A protein has these predicted regions:
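Short hydrophobic alpha-helices and adjacent helix-cap/hinge residues
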Residues: 1-182
Length: 182
């Protein structure tokens, strides 16, 4: 969200597309969704209104994009989930149809035309998974292996998309990018 705010400093409304089946729920949160609660806290600090769209299927994703113009979001944030990954191409198409700049959870979205992607380096996750498999094959008990979080993240910017929707990205945002698609 901070990248979006840096890219669009006048942004006041952010559409937030999420799938509740893919998030870990916590009894200690207001909504039961720690990711949503954190997003709400950050957007409030940034002076941005969070417009959540809870989706469980492609049909609900498409309906969310039909409904979005009613509240006029200035940007889109897509939360990582298998549903979003499976429908990444369609989500990007819908955002482009609405001229809605978005930040997406993985490089895959930027490769398909999404404006900005920020997320873990997928190849690194596979390498780390292989070390787990190796340990298990050598006799380690899976229950005794620590849970690891991603450590390598990448920022990918699609300049073709920026041009298509008529955006000029600030030089400081471009300078932070690990990869720029031209």
């Amino acid at each position: 969200m901070e990248i979006l705010k840096e890219t669009f400093p006048k942004m006041t409304r952010l559409a937030y597309l999420w799938n509740p089946l893919a998030v870990s729920y916590s009894a200690g949160t207001t909504s039961g969704n720690p990711s949503y609660d954190e997003a709400k806290k950050i957007t409030k600090t940034l002076g941005v209104q969070l417009l959540p769209y809870r989706v469980l299927s492609l049909a609900e994703i498409e309906k969310a994009f039909v409904d979005m113009p009613k509240v006029r979001p200035q940007a889109l944030l897509v939360l990582q989930s298998p549903l979003m990954t499976l429908n990444s191409k369609r989500i990007v198409e819908l955002a482009l149809e609405k001229h809605l700049p978005g930040i997406y959870p993985s490089n895959q979205f930027a490769q398909q035309g999404g404006l900005i992607a920020y997320g873990p380096v997928i190849a690194d996750l596979y390498r780390r998974a292989a070390t787990y498999v190796d340990k298990i094959l050598k006799g380690a008990e899976p229950a005794n292996l620590p849970i690891e979080q991603p450590t390598k993240f990448e920022l990918v910017i699609n300049l073709n998309t920026a041009k298509q929707i008529g955006l000029t990205l600030p030089p400081n945002v471009l300078a932070r990018a690990d990869k720029v698609i031209k």
